[in-house]
Amino acid sequence: MKTLLVLRISTVILVVLVIQKSYADILECDYFDTVDISAAQKLQNGSYLFEGLLVPAILTGEYDFRILPDDSKQKVARHIRGCVCKLKPCVRFCCPHDHIMDNGVCYDNMSDEELAELDPFLNVTLDDGSVSRRHFKNELIVQWDLPMPCDGMFYLDNREEQDKYTLFENGTFFRHFDRVTLRKREYCLQHLTFADGNATSIRIAPHNCLIVPSITGQTVVMISSLICMVLTIAVYLFVKKLQNLHGKCFICYMVCLFMGYLFLLLDLWQISISFCKPAGFLGYFFVMAAFFWLSVISLHLWNTFRGSSHKANRFLFEHRFLAYNTYAWGMAVVLTGITVLADNIVENQDWNPRVGHEGHCWIYTQAWSAMLYFYGPMVFLIAFNITMFILTAKRILGVKKDIQNFAHRQERKQKLNSDKQTYTFFLRLFIIMGLSWSLEIGSYFSQSNQTWANVFLVADYLNWSQGIIIFILFVLKRSTWRLLQESIRGEGEEVNNSEEEISLENTTTRNVLL
């Protein structure tokens, strides 16, 4: 009985060892940092001598699979791999080092003339930030047996400004035109023939696959957001009591936001590609108009509590909405006109907005020009809104103090509380919108850092869901819901102009106290 038990335990141990040997991943070594060293000389201590490099036994393993770019495993013949990239910098090739690539296909046995014509040097950015020019074969380990990144690849010609790239010592690859960092499984290098006028040259060129992010999440959020915007606009148009000056400005803001996001969605679905530039400029116009309407709201709130002479205030109230329209739409037209002009006459790519560039029907947000034409005005308007809301808050405190020292304070206190609620809701709107766009600006500055770019992805989702947030804040609140029910029953059709009243009351209060 004891002998049988020992035999069973031995069998289990043997099976475990066999399985472990079959899938002998090298400890703390990425598969894409290994090479096949089966043909290398094996020494008595278990280490291998590979291309003049001593690979210790602890950095070797027997594999009967290979890992594909999607992390799945493919069964292959058993072979020995070594984690040589921990010992010496590696360069990831698509095919063996003496092959040349043409239209994504590797061709073997380069001729002596082609080998003589080949430029064998690569610029490698070291860990300390310096750039070293290295011979691909003599100073680096060539990894050529890794699976191809994808079926269809495109190459980069670093003679072109838009095709610049950076190859790092640890094997990562940074593509400049879309500021994307690629791992070894997502790109490879190979010799390629380039035309140089009437002559040709052979150089090492990177071949990689575009990282196409899933648009499902963005699509769902943006469609939901657009639906909520339509519902919000409909409620404010249906309920007469909401159509005071605040409400009219808010409706204009929502219309601009809806149109801006609609053009973003059309760009996301590539629907606007047939009228790309006009779609890009129209989308830009409505987004900037939305920002100007948000500044109108903050300015109007401040003016509501500021107070002025009775006649002047009455005159301004009757014509203020026209003035606000002239300002918001006019400034958006001016900025859009400047952007259109710059897009057509500015030759320097760093100063050109490049609307419709790289297949996106929007202003090009990967370059410094985006700060000049898009994020710069955005920062200025956010700063203006912050200033207005702070000044309004100070004025509310001042009016509250005045009311405490004035007769009939209960009636005026009710009006103040009503406008304080209006201020609070619009302040909440600005905080949500200002925060989301501020994070968007942070996302713009962090594009070169993939880690921070992933963090700021939260800002993108917050931005895309603005319509949902506004619907919750402005329509699903109890007071709006009550007004909607009254309007459905045909009650209370009078427009609420309390913002004018509080301004006039505050002015009278101030004059009496003086």
UniProtKB/Swiss-Prot annotation:
Glycosylation sites: 45, 109, 123, 170, 198, 449
Compartmental location: Cell membrane
Keywords: Cell membrane, Disulfide bond, Exocytosis, G-protein coupled receptor, Glycoprotein, Membrane, Neurotransmitter transport, Receptor, Signal, Transducer, Transmembrane, Transmembrane helix, Transport
Any single biological process term in GO: synaptic vesicle exocytosis
SS bonds (residue pairs): 29-83, 85-90, 94-188, 95-106, 150-209
This protein's GO CC annotations: membrane; plasma membrane; presynapse
Described function: Involved in biological aging and stress response. Essential for adult survival. Required in the presynaptic motor neuron to up-regulate neurotransmitter exocytosis at larval glutamatergic neuromuscular junctions (NMJs). Regulates a step associated with docking and clustering of vesicles at release sites. SP/Acp70A and sun are agonists that activate mth in vitro.
Annotated protein name in UniProt: G-protein coupled receptor Mth
Gene: mth
